[in-house]
């Protein structure tokens, strides 16, 4: 969630907690916050050396809220995803599984070459999924969602099959 200043963040947290309370008490659901990379930035407002994600984890009501951790965006931000799950033990029920190709390059319109992490099919990148799944299960994660958003094959169904094949042969108990 993009917040231009600290007051906006506090207002967002207040409203999120208010909505979460309603959903939890009236319907039995917990609202979960899904991260991207910007919540982990060290440049966030420069307040007390905290990151935006630190404020969210401290200020969201643990009774009525939770977190959906996106493995790709956390890794892109330089976060150890397993350590994050351990820190949030019991508060993350859903984990988005995305892999990351570290040596991907793009050329900008002005001809510059940038090295940026790129999403790739599960099992083809740098994420250690067997260790991640083990930590996730030990910390209370119940649901795993594979997000194939970028297709190296230019064929979405082929890319999904590649991810499914990896999961079937490396992550599922036989």
Regions found by a protein language model. Give the residues of each.
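Histidine-acidic metal/acid-base catalytic patches
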Residues: 53-69, 73-174
């Amino acid at each position: 969630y993009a917040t231009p200043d600290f007051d906006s963040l506090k207002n967002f947290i207040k409203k999120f907690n208010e909505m979460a309370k309603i959903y939890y008490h009236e319907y039995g659901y917990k609202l979960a916050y899904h991260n991207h990379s910007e919540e982990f930035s060290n440049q966030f407002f420069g307040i007390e050396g905290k990151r935006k994600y630190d404020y969210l984890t401290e200020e969201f009501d643990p009774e009525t809220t939770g977190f959906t951790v996106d493995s790709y965006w956390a890794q892109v931000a330089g976060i150890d995803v397993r350590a994050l799950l351990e820190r949030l033990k019991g508060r993350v029920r859903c984990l988005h599984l995305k892999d990351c190709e570290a040596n991907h390059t793009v050329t900008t319109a002005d001809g510059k070459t940038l090295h940026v992490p790129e999403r790739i099919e599960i099992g083809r990148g740098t994420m250690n999924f067997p260790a991640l799944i083990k930590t996730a299960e030990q910390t209370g994660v119940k649901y795993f969602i594979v997000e194939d958003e970028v297709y190296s094959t230019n064929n979405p169904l082929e890319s999904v099959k590649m991810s499914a094949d990896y999961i079937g042969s490396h992550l599922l108990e036989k």
